[in-house]
Amino acid sequence: MLGILVVLCLIPAADVTENKILVAQRPLLIVANRTATLVCNYTYNGTGKEFRASLHKGTDSAVEVCFISWNMTKINSNSNKEFNCRGIHDKDKVIFNLWNMSASQTDIYFCKIEAMYPPPYVYNEKSNGTVIHVRETPIQTQEPESATSYWVMVAVTGLLGFYSMLITAVFIIYRQKSKRNRYRQSDYMNMTPRHPPHQKNKGYPSYAPTRDYTAYRSWQP
């Protein structure tokens, strides 16, 4: 009778030990490039064939970031709309890949592993979690470059505008001087010679020379 009681007491204890899930996480993960890889190592010696692993954010695990479920034939994964997360199952570990993270998502994250089927339903006790610290991407180095390039463009544009105005003004002045010189030359060309008022017009054109008849008279007999 005593032997039967000992056997009955040992069987439940063995079941509890066999179906227990233990999870191990690294305590700190620093993210500098907005991409994080969180590995959840677990041990399970039960007979479950369908599992679910999920990643939770916050000390109270209130936010489920993403999850992955798998069995012998298929794998299913889903992510919260506020996160970019994907889960991968690999033997005795689940890998959660997160990308495009922001500094506001810095928090403590917990892995939860569940044996869904067949019964009994088992899940791990809450682990110590992993603090994911997301560093803000520095953008101050880009501002001076953009400002400098902007002012360089403004200076070049202003200089080109000044030179174009200067060239236009020189061209206008040169054109006005050329017109004045043409007017003066046309006035000189239109002037005709005139006889003094005391000379009489002998019927010859103004350009014809006058003949001297005294030379002819000296030859008369």
From Swiss-Prot:
Keywords: Disulfide bond, Glycoprotein, Immunoglobulin domain, Membrane, Receptor, Signal, Transmembrane, Transmembrane helix. PANTHER family: CYTOTOXIC T-LYMPHOCYTE PROTEIN, T-CELL-SPECIFIC SURFACE GLYCOPROTEIN CD28. It comes from the Eukaryota. Monomer. This is T-cell-specific surface glycoprotein CD28 homolog. GO terms for cellular component: external side of plasma membrane; plasma membrane. It is found in: Membrane. Possibly involved in T-cell activation. Glycans are attached at residues 33, 41, 45, 71, 100, 128. Disulfide bonds join 40-111, 66-85. Residues 188-209 are annotated as: Disordered. The chain crosses the membrane at residues 150-174. Residues 28-137 form the Ig-like V-type domain. Residues 1-13 form the signal peptide. Residues 14-149 are extracellular. Residues 175-221 are cytoplasmic. It is a single-pass type I membrane protein. The gene is CD28. Pfam families: V-set. Coiled coil: none annotated. Gene3D superfamilies: Immunoglobulins. One of its GO terms (biological process) is T cell receptor signaling pathway.
